[in-house]
Amino acid sequence: MGSKSTVENGPVKVHVHLYYGVDPDCYRKDEDVGCLYGYHYAESEKMSLSYSRDHPEGRVLRTIRRGLKALLGCDLIHTYRNRAAVLQADVIWTHTEREYLSAALLLMLKRGRDKPLLLAQSVWLLDIWESLSLVKRVIFKKLLGRANLLTTLTTDNAALVKKFWNRDATVTLYGISTDDFPLQRISQWRPHAPLRVAAIGNDRDRDWQTFMAAFENDARFTARLATQRKVSQPSVADNVVIAPVLGLAEQRALYDWADVIVVPLRPNHHASGITVLLEAVMAGKAVVATGVGGLSDYFSSDAVAYVPVYDPRSLRERVAALGADPQGTTERIRRAQQELILKDLTTRGYARQHVMLTHKMLRHASSSETVSSLIRA
C-alpha cells in the first residue's frame, strides 16, 4: 500500500459509496436526516467523510445505467461518475456488493501504489453465488481480491464467505435510526380481540404466502399486510387486508395499530427483515419471525419468537400463544428492547463499528507497509 493507507496527518478521509438515489444532499432533504444507514455519525475531527453523489441523467442514460447494473451486478457508471472522490479517499466504505465490485474495479484500473483501502460489505451476493455463471464467479473473486476487509451483517453470511471465497469476514450489526423510531417502553402489553397482526416489507425474501395461510379466515386474528409487491391471494379472506403503506407516518401508524409484528421469510443468510424487526422492537411490539437469515445474531429466542420456515401452522399458533399470555409477552418485549440497547443496534452503533474497523485496517496496512519496506531494504 502507498501513503494513503498510512495517513497520519489530519483526519482520515473516508468515502461512503452508496447506491444511486440516496445522495445525502437529496435524500429526505427537507428532513435533514443525513446519510442513509447513519454513516454520518462517524464524522469527527479525526475522520472526515465524503459521499457518493447522484449525477443528473435523462431517461435514456438512466435506462442504460440500470441495464448495465442488472447485467453486471454492480453500478459501473455511478461509480465512474464518483471516481474523483473514490480515489482521493484513504478508505472506502460500501454497503453492498453492488457498490464494492465497481469500486474494486476502479481501484484495480488505477495505476500506482497510492490507493485507498476498501471495506467491502456483502449482503445478497453470497445467497446467489452458486447460481452465478462460472465467468461471473471468476471475475467477482478477482475483484474481491482488491478488498482489504470483508464484512457481512450476519454470522451466516460470514460462514459463506469462508466457504466460497476462503476468506475471513467481520460481522457488523445493522442498526436503526432512533430519530425515525424512538424507543417506546411499555408498562403492560394489552392485546386487542381479535388479535391484530401486521407484516410489512418489500424484500424479495418475504414469504407472504405463509403469512396469509397462517391467518386468513381465522376469527382469532385480523391481519394487515403492507407491501408494494404484487401478492396473490388464494382465497377470499375478510380478515386480511393487503395494501402498501406510503411514507414514514403511515408506517408508524401501522406499528401503532398492531399487537404483533410478523416477519415471514424464505431461506436466506443476509438478515432479511432486520429493519422491520428493529422497528417493531423500538415500537414496543411483540415480534414473531422465521428463524432464518442470521436474525438470532441480533435477538435471542427469549426476545423474539422464531418459527420454522414455510410453516403457517407454527406461525399461527405462536402468535396465538403470545396473545394468550400478556404478561409473558410483556417480558419478551422488554427483553428485546434490553438486547437492542446492550448491542447498540442503532445507526450510531453501526457507524461506530465502521470507525473501529477503519482504524484496524489502517493499523494493519501501516504494519504491512513497514514489513515491505524492511524487505525491500
At which residue positions do the language-model features occur?
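A charged, aromatic-enriched C-terminal amphipathic alpha-helix characteristic of glycosyltransferases
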Residues: 327-358
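Short hydrophobic beta-strand element within catalytic cores of glycosyltransferases
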Residues: 261, 282, 286-289
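Membrane-proximal helix-turn-helix segments that form the acceptor-binding/catalytic region
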Residues: 80-88, 132-149
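Short acidic/histidine- and often glycine-rich active-site loop of Leloir-type glycosyltransferases
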Residues: 234-235, 292-306
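Acidic anion/phosphate-binding donor-loop and adjacent secondary structure
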Residues: 159, 163, 176-193, 234, ...
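Conserved acidic donor-binding segment of nucleotide-sugar-dependent glycosyltransferases
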Residues: 202, 301-313, 320-327
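Conserved catalytic-core segment of nucleotide-activated headgroup transferases in glycan assembly
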Residues: 34, 189-236, 241-249
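Nucleotide-sugar-dependent
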Residues: 249, 263-278, 291-292, 296-297
